[in-house]
Amino acid sequence: MAPSLLTEDLLSNTFLFHENLNLPIMHNKRSGTTPKLILFIASTKDTAGMNIAKQLIDHYNFEKLSESFHKNPVYSKTFQNKETKLLFINTEIVDTQFLGDLFNPNLLVFLSRHSSASGIPTLSVHTPGNLSEAKFGGTPRNVSISPAAAMKNALLEMAKLKDERGLDYEVSYECTHHGPSLNVPAMFAELGSSPKQWKDSKAAEVVAHAAVAAVSECSNCSVALGIGGPHYNKKFTKLALTTQRAFGHIIPKYALPQVDADIIKQCVERTVGTVDSAVLDWKGIKGEHKPKIIAALEKLGVHSERV
């Protein structure tokens, strides 16, 4: 077993071994303790993810360990007294539901490509999970825990560096979508939106720095749920970049026909930190959906505001 994953009291942990790996997996059973572990995940099937991972290794001097995962090397680095592991998987990144059975990290950051028909160069962050059916990984009507502060930190770093380096990229939140649906804080840091951008080493470096920024604390953040508007919500993005607001889950207009009070409750409860408010993109919500949203938020005691 790798010493780097051990805690002081071995009796408080259970170690499992996943098929095709020799990396010990820790589940901490000691009441009130959480392993200080951050995971960065990239898929060998993902050009952008591998590009971002290379930038992490090159710019942050990640150490190659003797461990392996999915028959791939494992890298490690300590940030702010938090052990950070960089792992490579051989499946598509949305098909990683199995990770929830293996790890219990403080934060899991997926390094990923972003694809869109528009092809607009984009740097983005979002929480994975399914607001309705599970078309692309994960489980139906089940969202991951949203690390709102971590995503805000990553978004801020993306915006700062792309301006400093003169990169012609949009920076944006995306709504909560696709798998996996994990019971740990999880986020995607993405580079897109076409193969040209996936291979852009300068943009990949920005995403790598953003992933590291996600590890930082954000004690002054005001955590919010976003509802309404498009898949890429410029209003929510601007609020996060110019105020203390940090968005966790974002429910877009197109998902609202399938969203009910239970999903809204889940999005509030499955967010790191207390959700102080729900920000409603009022013009981006059909009139027929507004009453159920307001009623659900009132029942939860969550203040709402319109933008």
Residue ranges of each PLM-predicted region?
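Hydrophobic "anchor" residues on beta-strands that sit immediately upstream
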Residues: 186
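Short glycine/threonine-rich loop-to-helix capping motif typified by GTGT followed
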Residues: 233-242
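N-terminal catalytic or cofactor-binding beta/alpha core of small enzyme domains
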Residues: 9-183, 194-195, 201-205, 212-234, ...
